[in-house]
């Protein structure tokens, strides 16, 4: 099966909205609901959302009515939140499941991208990371000068990123064990 982990455990302090960024609304719908809906429309049968501690009621309300969705409290860093979310998925899904890791702060991902990432993993890819061309001018800054970087060689990394659940969880457990 295809399952998803939506990372929404950030506090959103840089945004200055006074609530977690994932709960901010875009067109009357929270970012987290838009992101989870895209995962479901793209084929995810189960979705785990990592959330900040103490926000369980707010996230339950934001995600009300969406099928196959559960929330777990994330950790202090994104990597911790991903590991905790993967552990939750591993308790309910086989290790061979395709897991799509997605940032709640990217609510406009088309379900077609979700399906393409999942399909590539199902067809044998070990890891699938969608990228888009960089359109902005980028400068590499040194001590006393700077130069334009050839943007034709650059790509911006997007989510969801696809893997096999067991392999990604094992990598995260190893990283956590090594500190």
What is the meaning of each model-derived region?
Residues 1-56, 68:
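N-terminal glycine-rich phosphate-binding loop and ensuing alpha1 helix
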Residues 4-6, 49, 101, 127-130:
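Structural beta-sheet core signal
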Residues 56-62:
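Acidic helix N-cap motif at the loop->helix transition within catalytic regions
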Residues 78, 104-108:
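Acidic metal-phosphate-binding loop of nucleotide-sugar-dependent transferases
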Residues 109-179:
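Conserved core of the sugar-phosphate nucleotidyltransferase
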């Amino acid at each position: 099966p295809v399952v998803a982990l939506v990372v929404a455990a950030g506090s959103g302090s840089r945004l200055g909205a006074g609530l977690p960024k994932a709960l901010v609304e875009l067109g009357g719908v929270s970012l987290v609901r838009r992101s989870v809906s895209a995962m479901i429309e793209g084929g995810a049968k189960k979705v785990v959302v990592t959330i900040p501690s103490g926000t369980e009621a707010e996230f339950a309300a934001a995600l009300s009515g969406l099928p196959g969705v559960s929330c777990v409290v994330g950790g202090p860093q994104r990597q911790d939140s991903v590991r905790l979310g993967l552990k939750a998925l591993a308790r309910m899904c086989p290790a061979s499941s395709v897991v799509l890791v997605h940032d709640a702060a990217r609510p406009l991902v088309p379900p077609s991208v979700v399906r393409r990432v999942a399909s590539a993993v199902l067809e044998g890819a070990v890891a699938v990371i969608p990228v888009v061309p960089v359109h902005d001018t980028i400068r590499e800054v040194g001590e006393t000068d700077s130069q334009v970087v050839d943007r034709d060689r650059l790509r911006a990394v997007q989510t969801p990123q696809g893997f096999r659940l067991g392999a990604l969880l094992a990598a995260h457990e190893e990283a956590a064990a090594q500190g």
